Regions:
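Short, surface-exposed "cap/lid" segments of acyl-processing enzymes
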Residues: 1-43
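Gly/Ala-rich beta-loop-alpha elbow adjacent to hydrolase catalytic centers
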Residues: 74-82
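Active-site nucleophile loop of the alpha/beta-hydrolase fold
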Residues: 95-105
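Active-site nucleophile elbow and catalytic-triad environment of alpha/beta-hydrolase enzymes
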Residues: 143-160
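Short beta-strand/loop motif that positions the catalytic acidic residue
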Residues: 164, 170-172, 176
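Short alpha-helix in the alpha/beta-hydrolase fold that links the catalytic acid
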Residues: 166, 180-189
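Acidic catalytic loop of the alpha/beta-hydrolase fold
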Residues: 175-179, 206
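Catalytic histidine-centered segment of alpha/beta-hydrolase-like enzymes
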Residues: 203-214
């Protein structure tokens, strides 16, 4: 059986923001693991004092616990952690949804300095569909100090991407108000994979919460089944 590790994003609810994807993959026959990264799934204040190394430690432990063959399916900040895992641990298939290699907010690069005077940032309700927007489970705000850790992690990723050679799928949101489209494209172009695909959806940043969530989940499942069938053995 093939195993899939799903990594959620920064401020994301570890279960709810993954939408239909985990269940779609399970029904297809994959073994699915979806760890909760430290500081998530509770309240924004629990991100205070959490370092990027803490997120990576949890992701690494969860990944190493999975038998091969194994795939990485990642979202936003999770695509930074996933890239580090894929480059350093290897993987059979790699999916990166709206990877957080840059940020639309012009204040984002200033977070290391702003944290002393601006303790929190407002979260982005990155869902276009009005009804789904009302039920967004992500944190409404987050500690600036925690975002600084995201920036520290992000700086490490560009040199790692050429080391990833597994089949890769990168998904972009056409109306993303969080991650610039150019940053997602750069992530894709830096990947060392000889077999890689790039898809764009009529969606906001939260691909698995917005109106295209079902389509995204089905597309990820179909792609995985091509490159790593659920019944594949080591």
């Amino acid at each position: 059986m093939a195993h899939v590790l799903i990594l959620h994003g920064f401020t994301s609810h570890p279960i709810l923001t993954l939408g239909p994807l985990p269940e779609v993959l399970r029904r297809a026959g994959y073994s699915v693991s979806q760890p909760t990264l430290p500081g998530h799934g509770t309240r924004p204040e629990d991100l205070v004092g959490v370092r990027w190394e803490d997120w990576y430690r949890v992701a690494l432990e969860a990944y190493r616990s999975l038998p091969e063959p194994r795939a990485l399916v990642t979202l936003s900040m999770g695509a930074l952690l996933g890239a580090k895992l894929a480059a350093e641990e290897g993987t059979s298939a790699f999916v990166a949804m709206v990877p957080a290699l840059g940020f639309v907010n012009p204040l984002a690069p200033l977070a290391p300095y702003l944290r002393w005077v601006v303790p929190t940032f407002k979260g982005t309700n990155a869902v276009r569909d009005p009804q789904r927007k009302k039920n967004n489970p992500n944190y409404p705000y987050f500690p600036t100090s925690a975002f600084v850790e995201v920036l520290k992690l992000r700086r490490q990723i560009p040199p790692l991407l050429p080391r990833i050679t597994a089949p890769a799928l990168v998904l972009q949101a056409q109306h993303d108000s969080t991650i610039p489209q150019a940053a997602v494209r750069r992530y894709y172009e830096l990947l060392g994979s000889s077999s890689k695909e790039y898809k764009v959806y009529d969606s906001e940043h939260d691909l698995l919460l917005d109106a295209k969530a079902d389509e995204v989940a089905q597309d990820v499942n179909a792609w995985l089944k091509r490159v790593l069938p659920p019944t594949q053995s080591p």
